[in-house]
Amino acid sequence: YSSYGGQTKNPYNLKRDPSGSSSGTAAAVAAGFAPFGLGSDTSGSVRGPASVTGTVGMRVTYGQTSRSGVIPLSDSFDVTGAITNTVEDQALVLDAIVGPAEGDVATLQATQDTQYEKSLAQASLKGARLGIVNVFNGGNSEVDETFKAAQNELEKAGATLVNINLDK
């Protein structure tokens, strides 16, 4: 929400809420206004909006990215994360923003050892075991079909899917 512009809209369905405090960033990226944006995440403020706008959001490890300019809800838990349109874009942005930052003591031990973009090998899911929770299926057939198609793609990429049953 913005006091200037009002309620942020989900660009894929203007009747749907874009979720979370980084919803403006996610909506802007999803609408094509920017190739990426940054948001702060305490308990889902990057990941929630990404999940409902068809974008990619990731919570980085605490201390890996600068929180300069962020007013923290929890100084020992808040992180800055990117919202992008693709996993590849996410990796490129992480390569640019991960590392020590002057003025943010939490990042003093941050390392730039990982090269995220170079880590995007096709074989990266070979041998991975991923838990699949199906308790949410059945509410929307279109979502169920998309979820199943995603599972098929994960298996094609070499992942082993393990069904997880949650007690209701």
Give residue spans per PLM region:
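Short glycine/serine-rich loop segments
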Residues: Y1-I97
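Beta-sheet entry/capping signal
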Residues: P35-F36, R129, T160
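A short helix-breaking turn/cap at a secondary-structure junction
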Residues: V56-A150
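Conserved dinucleotide-binding and phosphotransfer motif residues
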Residues: A157
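General small-molecule cofactor/ligand-binding pocket signal
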Residues: T160-D167
